[in-house]
Amino acid sequence: SQYIGPAGEVLYFNSETGDRGKSNLPLPGDDVGRTNIVILASKNLGKTMAIYRAAFGLGQGFVMPTPNKLVAEAQGLEAGAMFRLGFITLRERGNAIHFDEYTDSSAPRQAAKGMLPQACAMVSFNVDNLDAVDADFVADPITEYGGMRSAVFKGPAGELVELIEADR
């Protein structure tokens, strides 16, 4: 389900109401679980997906055209406007990156100098080995989070991606 939040953000919620054994959703830790799909908007879907596939060693994923009423409304387009959507699954069950290709009618998010843009500006992922990730980090990795190394890179759409080296 899609909802507009109090700051105008688009929130997606999913729930498991069927057979848990057949579901691809991760098990929640409580009544509300954790993020399992992150959404990245980009003006060049193919390039953006290719960068993530290379950086994380991900599979091909898929791309399909689809209508999205909320995105169309936010961009001042007709409700039936078609958008290209991409989807790449991650290692853990039910986790994925969902890519939306925005049209030229969408404006870049504005940010004050030295500040993050409005809405989601950063996401974190666990990785096995920071040194194996093909990314230009904004600074050398640091040790935090109880002794785990982490580093941040700037993605192709201007997003910040924190990688945390974690044992699984």
Where are these regions (language model features)?
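Eukaryotic modular interaction domains in large regulatory/scaffold proteins
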Residues: S105-A107
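Amphipathic alpha-helical segments
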Residues: N44-Q60, A132-D134
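Vicinal oxygen chelate
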Residues: S1-G33, I39-L40, Q60-L90, G94-E101, ...
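Low-complexity, glycine/alanine/valine/leucine- and proline-rich hydrophobic stretches
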Residues: A119-N126
